[in-house]
């Protein structure tokens, strides 16, 4: 990270959990330098509720922000998001939070859209980028857990809730679900992670952009990569070895991959059957049928993708990764590729070419 680049740590409290429809009621943000030292004035804003969207009662209970409080302290949404955009759009800013790419960034995008502003430009123009500490934290738990206290849920798996991590590691958090308290707590977690393994922190930071992570992809050799994602679940340490097999046919930010921890039995099945099982909701799959181990990774969402060297030296064993099994599955995929050089990639791409989505009602 160059000396001129900065992180802008931020968090929203909202009227509900649907980022596409629910509204931001509180925002907090603060800027740090590359050393995670605060260099700007903290910013806290409220937005007035809008009459076209009722708040969810659970959101009021969790955040403690009532419609009356938001109305009293809040700005009109257009002024609210304009002030936020002013910070996030500063050149060479990396917007970051905890679960920010999946939630907070979507809140920002939709608020900008409702205000007739460009929803995306601030994420990539003028040397800007975005990052998310949640998957970084998952990567540390799997790959470099030493030096950090990892809270455990009732089901025996690690809790990645921000308030649980701060409590376990003696980090002051103030009032959880207060936007500024969450921002400060996130910065302190980042400092802890970096102290424990600066190399992993800096590596993940360098590879947060689409261009950087694309450089790891080798479709010609079918080179496997380490992928960390909450989609794999606690039983798998939120990690899998995957092999990129094709680019999405219509979205060049999406990479089609196969999970090497699962058998590639789908290679023997007709494409229409594979497609049916791939996009059928889990609860509706026939008994005894597993979803094909094929997924897309969105490279413009700062995914954690690393070379397999990161699971060398006993790390794979600690994660329960069966090297022989993974090599066997990779060999089957490479054999299928060698048998049909032209059709191998096309077959994966065709799974998404006929994809349809149910209509969404109001």
Predicted regions and their residues:
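Extended alpha-helical coiled-coil/bundle linker/stalk regions that scaffold oligomerization
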Residues: 251-330
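N-terminal accessory regions of nucleic-acid-interacting proteins
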Residues: 1-7
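Conserved beta-strand and immediately adjacent loop positions that scaffold enzyme active sites
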Residues: 6, 26-28, 254-256
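Acidic catalytic cores of enzymes that act on phosphate-bearing nucleotides/polynucleotides
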Residues: 206-283
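Conserved DEDDh/DEDDy metal-dependent 3′-5′ exonuclease domain
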Residues: 62-145, 305-361
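Short acidic, Gly/Ser-rich segments with clustered Asp/Glu that frequently serve as metal-coordination loops
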Residues: 13-20
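Short hydrophobic beta-strand that contains or immediately precedes a catalytic carboxylate
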Residues: 9-11, 259
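Metal-dependent phosphoesterase core characteristic of DEDDh/y 3'-5' exonuclease domains
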Residues: 21-27, 31-65, 86-199, 204
């Amino acid at each position: 990270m160059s000396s001129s680049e900065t992180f802008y740590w931020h968090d929203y409290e909202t009227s509900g959990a649907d980022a596409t429809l629910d509204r931001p009621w509180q925002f907090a943000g603060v800027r740090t330098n590359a050393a995670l030292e605060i260099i700007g004035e903290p910013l806290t804003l409220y937005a007035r509720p809008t009459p076209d969207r009722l708040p969810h009662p659970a959101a009021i209970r969790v955040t403690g922000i009532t419609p009356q409080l938001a109305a009293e302290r809040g700005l009109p949404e257009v002024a609210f998001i304009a002030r936020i955009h002013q910070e996030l759009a500063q050149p060479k800013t990396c917007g970051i939070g905890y679960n920010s790419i999946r939630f907070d960034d979507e809140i920002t995008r939709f608020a900008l859209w409702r205000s007739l502003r460009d929803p995306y430009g601030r994420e990539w123009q003028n040397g800007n980028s975005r990052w998310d500490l949640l998957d970084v934290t998952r990567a540390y738990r799997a790959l470099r857990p030493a030096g950090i206290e990892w809270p455990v849920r009732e089901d025996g798996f690690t809790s990645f809730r921000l308030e649980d991590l701060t409590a376990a590691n003696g980090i002051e958090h103030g009032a959880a679900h207060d936007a500024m308290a969450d921002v400060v707590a996130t910065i302190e977690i980042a400092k802890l992670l970096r102290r424990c393994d600066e190399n992993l922190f800096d590596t993940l930071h360098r590879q947060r952009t689409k261009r950087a992570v694309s450089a790891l992809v080798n479709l010609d050799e079918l080179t496997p990569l380490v992928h960390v994602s909450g989609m794999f679940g606690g039983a798998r340490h939120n990690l899998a070895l995957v092999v990129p097999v094709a680019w999405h046919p219509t979205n060049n930010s999406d990479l089609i991959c196969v999970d090497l921890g699962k058998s590639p039995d789908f290679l023997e099945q007709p494409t229409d059957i594979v497609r049916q099982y791939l996009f059928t909701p889990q609860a509706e799959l026939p008994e005894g049928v597993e979803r094909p181990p094929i997924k897309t990774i969105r490279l413009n969402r700062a995914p954690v993708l690393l070379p397999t060297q990161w699971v060398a030296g006993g790390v794979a064993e600690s994660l329960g990764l069966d090297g022989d099994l993974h090599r066997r599955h990779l060999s089957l995929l490479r054999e299928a590729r060698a048998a049909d050089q032209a059709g191998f990639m096309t077959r994966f791409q065709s799974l998404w070419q006929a994809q349809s989505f149910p209509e969404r009602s109001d």
